[in-house]
């Protein structure tokens, strides 16, 4: 049987067998606790340059289909994939092939047969770190593999939004009669998931998806009713262009909504700082408290950076008073910020789910109300 190894920056090595393509994959080792939704995870652009370790013991049971991908063209964005027990066959009426076949087709290097529980416990105690998956011709002496892992760029300080953003603007038309829309939204693609424009379309909104390099002047030409900041990979401390753009949007009084990376961008635009978490939040059952109502939503999340702040914290900004609106019930991490006057808000989690619960989908309706002038 062929051999594959997962090598961590601190020298820990886990031995298994190849899964998917063979060769070398370098990235940051992170773990995802979702028991389902692996296709959505693999195709989420926020996982760019990360090696995802699945905590669920069996992966691939439902194969691969043409409907659940969260990227255009079904592109897999993870750098590598580590699993315990991959299913050798697909068992689902929508499946068009197996997970391993798709990994091979897209040349994603993976590893199977390792003790993923041990990997996750290690990452929980030591933190997410540089890693590599090696098999076949990429195998070498442990010291050489560790050196390769350590030589790669850290996620801290990585500016990645431009690597996953669309190169050209495109439009997602609203559902319903052609040419009829309630509102127009300018969505900045920092790594947007395809289910987000779908949520706008279902609400009768025309969504212009724009490159991460878009200027305020280009947004203003669209005369949008609102601006959306998407999820995405990398360190938000490097996203100075998007932060400056967000401040221009706020200064113009255009309603604004942000998700995940977009939450960190809005927070920075309002004066908060960000930090790299020890191992982040990646899963589909993470509880979040809304401090305006006291209600808890079970949410889907994928982030390794967060905003500095505390529950209910109020702070002054050039655009008026703001508040930390949401925090994680597990560890108190900031999960949302907003301007008190309501014209800009964001959350760290994913109300569009895909995969995950739909507890927070109402936030899209809140944005619609804001654009209609009812939420001011």
From Swiss-Prot:
Catalytic residues (UniProt): 260, 350, 352
Pathway linked to the protein: Amino-acid biosynthesis; L-arginine biosynthesis; carbamoyl phosphate from bicarbonate: step 1/1; Pyrimidine metabolism; UMP biosynthesis via de novo pathway; (S)-dihydroorotate from bicarbonate: step 1/3
PROSITE patterns cross-referenced by the UniProt entry: GATASE_TYPE_1 (PS51273)
Record GO terms (molecular function): ATP binding; carbamoyl-phosphate synthase (glutamine-hydrolyzing) activity; glutaminase activity
Origin species: Mycobacterium tuberculosis (strain ATCC 25618 / H37Rv)
Protein name: Carbamoyl phosphate synthase small chain
GO biological process: 'de novo' pyrimidine nucleobase biosynthetic process; 'de novo' UMP biosynthetic process; glutamine metabolic process; L-arginine biosynthetic process
Quaternary assembly: Composed of two chains; the small (or glutamine) chain promotes the hydrolysis of glutamine to ammonia, which is used by the large (or ammonia) chain to synthesize carbamoyl phosphate. Tetramer of heterodimers (alpha,beta)4.
This enzyme's EC code(s): 6.3.5.5
UniProt keyword Oxidoreductase, yes or no: no
Gene name of the record: carA
Database matches in Pfam families: CPSase_sm_chain (PF00988), GATase (PF00117)
Region (CPSase): 1-183
Spans traversing the lipid bilayer: none
GO cellular component: carbamoyl-phosphate synthase complex; cytoplasm
Reaction(s) the record says it catalyses: hydrogencarbonate + L-glutamine + 2 ATP + H2O = carbamoyl phosphate + L-glutamate + 2 ADP + phosphate + 2 H(+)
SMART domains from the UniProt entry: CPSase_sm_chain (SM01097)
Enzyme class: ligase
Record keywords: Amino-acid biosynthesis, Arginine biosynthesis, ATP-binding, Glutamine amidotransferase, Ligase, Nucleotide-binding, Pyrimidine biosynthesis
Family to which this protein belongs: Belongs to the CarA family.
Record's function text: Small subunit of the glutamine-dependent carbamoyl phosphate synthetase (CPSase). CPSase catalyzes the formation of carbamoyl phosphate from the ammonia moiety of glutamine, carbonate, and phosphate donated by ATP, constituting the first step of 2 biosynthetic pathways, one leading to arginine and/or urea and the other to pyrimidine nucleotides. The small subunit (glutamine amidotransferase) binds and cleaves glutamine to supply the large subunit with the substrate ammonia.
Chain positions recorded as L-glutamine binding sites: 46, 232, 234, 261, 264, 302, 304-305
Superkingdom per UniProt: Bacteria
Domain Glutamine amidotransferase type-1, first and last residues per copy: 184-376
Record's keyword annotation contains Mitochondrion: no
């Amino acid at each position: 049987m062929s051999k594959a190894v997962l090598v961590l920056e601190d020298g820990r090595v886990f031995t298994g067998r190849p899964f998917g393509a063979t060769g070398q994959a370098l990235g940051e080792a992170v773990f995802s606790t979702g028991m389902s939704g692996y296709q959505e995870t693999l195709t989420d652009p926020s996982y760019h340059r990360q090696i995802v370790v699945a905590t669920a013991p069996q992966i691939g049971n439902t194969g691969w289909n043409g409907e659940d991908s969260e990227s255009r063209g079904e592109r897999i964005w993870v750098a590598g994939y580590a699993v315990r027990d991959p299913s050798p066959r697909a068992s689902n009426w929508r499946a068009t092939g197996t997970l391993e076949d798709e990994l091979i087709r897209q040349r994603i290097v993976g590893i199977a047969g390792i003790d993923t529980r041990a990997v996750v416990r290690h990452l929980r105690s030591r933190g997410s770190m540089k890693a590599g998956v090696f098999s076949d011709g990429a195998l070498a002496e442990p010291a050489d593999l560790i050196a390769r892992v350590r030589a790669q760029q850290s996620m801290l300080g990585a500016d990645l939004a431009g690597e996953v953003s669309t190169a050209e603007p495109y439009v997602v038309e609203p559902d319903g009669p052609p040419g009829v829309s309630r509102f127009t939204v300018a969505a900045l693609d920092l790594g947007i998931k395809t289910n987000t424009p779908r949520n706008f379309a279902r609400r009768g909104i025309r969504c212009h998806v724009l490159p991460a390099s878009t200027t305020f002047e280009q947004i203003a030409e669209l005369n949008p009713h609102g601006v959306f900041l998407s999820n995405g990979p990398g360190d938000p401390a490097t996203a100075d262009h998007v932060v400056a753009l967000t401040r221009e949007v706020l200064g113009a009084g255009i309603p604004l909504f942000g998700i995940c990376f977009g939450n960190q961008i809005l927070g920075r635009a309002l004066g908060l700082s960000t930090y790299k978490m020890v191992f982040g939040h990646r899963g589909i059952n993470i509880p979040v408290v809304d401090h305006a109502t006291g209600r808890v939503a079970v949410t889907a999340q994928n982030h390794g950076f967060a905003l500095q702040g505390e529950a209910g914290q109020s702070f002054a900004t050039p655009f008026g008073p703001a508040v930390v609106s949401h925090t994680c019930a597990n560890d108190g991490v900031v999960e949302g910020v907003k301007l008190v006057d309501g014209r800009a808000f964001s959350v760290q989690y994913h109300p569009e789910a895909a995969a995950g619960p739909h507890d927070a989908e109402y936030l899209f309706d809140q944005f619609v109300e804001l654009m209609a002038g009812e939420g001011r």
